[in-house]
Amino acid sequence: KMVTVLLTAAMATAMAAGCGKSSDSGSDKKESYTIGIEQFAEHGSLDNCREGFLKGLEDEGIKEGDNLTVKYKNAAADMGTAKQISDSLVSDKVDLVCAIATPSAQSAYNAAMKADIPVIYTAVTDPVAAELADKDGKPVGEVTGTSDKLPVEEQLKMIREMLPDAKKIGIMYTTSEANSVSAIEEYKSLVKKYDFELVEKGITTTADVSLAADDLLSKVDCITNLTDNTVVASLPTILDKANEKKIPVFGSEIEQVKIGCLAAEGIDYIALGKQTGKMAAKVLKGEDHRAWILCK
């Protein structure tokens, strides 16, 4: 089996956009809160986001079991389920929704936009492509959060240094995930600079992963992962097949390296979630958010 040889953690930049219910004075603050956490899939990076999010809230004096009630729901990487969860949390009139991963962020925002419920997202690769911000990076409504945009050029540079003779690099991605489509476009713009040819393989569900992996592995010298929820949830299958063919697989964050990817230039998702939790605490406490702007 392949062994972990390298991991470089790159902290993501927080993206702050107008969000949340503002109050004119401290007397309007609630003493306790109910929030919904909608997570698109269960895998290491998103689980770490959730863990960090709750730690960030706790650092700001909002602690589950004390003055915080959490309604956690997981969509199991299914868009239809994500919509049901979003609608349910809005129906429950939670004080805030934390949406983890791009599909859940889109679903939560669409459900909450007319209900005056703020949405704080995390692990969203490209808020503009996901239509959570406009083309200038300005907020589109009651939504803000943090981005886990991939350091694509650093990843390509690392792969080239580790595999000087590799020619074809493969990427599997979910065609319905805006974050993945955006990342693919960035890879396309940079692969030639590092003397690679990009081979893409699109899928729609986890059921496609096994055959897609077989096809991709027959055409490439290595594979690099995105922060694609459907693919990452099926990563053990891809790694097993890649190990049989002795084809290295590069991850996009530390949890993927822990389970067998060769290396990654990626993000500390606990720290990302923690930063998001601190942002959520400010919204819950009624801090005036109108001065917040979306950073690049």
Please report, for each region that a protein language model flagged, where it lies by residue.
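Short beta-strand elements at the ligand-binding edges of bilobed clamshell
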Residues: 129-160, 259-274
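Beta-alpha junction/loop-to-helix N-cap segments that form part of ligand/metal-binding clefts
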Residues: 74-134, 228-243, 247-250
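An alpha-beta-alpha
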Residues: 35, 53, 144-191, 292-296
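Hinge/cleft segment of the Venus flytrap/periplasmic-binding protein
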Residues: 282-296
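Extracytoplasmic "Venus flytrap"
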Residues: 34-60, 71-80, 176-180, 230
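Structural motif
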Residues: 69-91, 202-216
